[in-house]
């Protein structure tokens, strides 16, 4: 019996097939297998953020524990089978939440890259890049940034520990995150 209660077959009155075709069943099974692989690759903290039913968590944990290739493949197939027994809305909710967290991770990486680009530009170009930064981020503390730039250059020249270099990154990261929370994405050119 299928989830909708109909057996695969043909409606005698209309001639239409009941239930999904075998090809559709295979595609669905493959999609669920891919989803199970993604779930098995997540950390426990990431799994906790997803709307996963309690009865699937032991299977996911068991899959993560197995290291043997063939045994892991078999366990992934079993996990996918257990997931196919779940309601379609449950699987869709897991997919949506997983995609949303992936998008959030991409945004965080983009913010880190933007911060690194600004730090590099400030150290290479000096005052011209600082002026542009202050135009894009008017809330920035000009004196603090100048001091951190000076100290970073001094540290590099003397081969000292990059304390000001790291602090400059933290200050820039704070500026960019504050700006991003206001939904005004600016990137250096």
Curated annotation (Swiss-Prot):
GO terms of molecular function: ribosome binding; rRNA binding
Alphabetized InterPro entries for the sequence: DarP, DarP_sf
Region annotation (Disordered) ranges: 1-22
Pfam families according to UniProt: DarP
Keyword field contains Cell inner membrane: no
GO terms, biological process: assembly of large subunit precursor of preribosome
CDD domains in the record: YjgA-like
Matching HAMAP family: DarP
UniProt family annotation: Belongs to the DarP family.
NCBIfam families in alphabetical order: PRK05255.1-1 (NF003593)
Function, in words: Member of a network of 50S ribosomal subunit biogenesis factors which assembles along the 30S-50S interface, preventing incorrect 23S rRNA structures from forming. Promotes peptidyl transferase center (PTC) maturation.
Name this protein carries in UniProt: Dual-action ribosomal maturation protein DarP
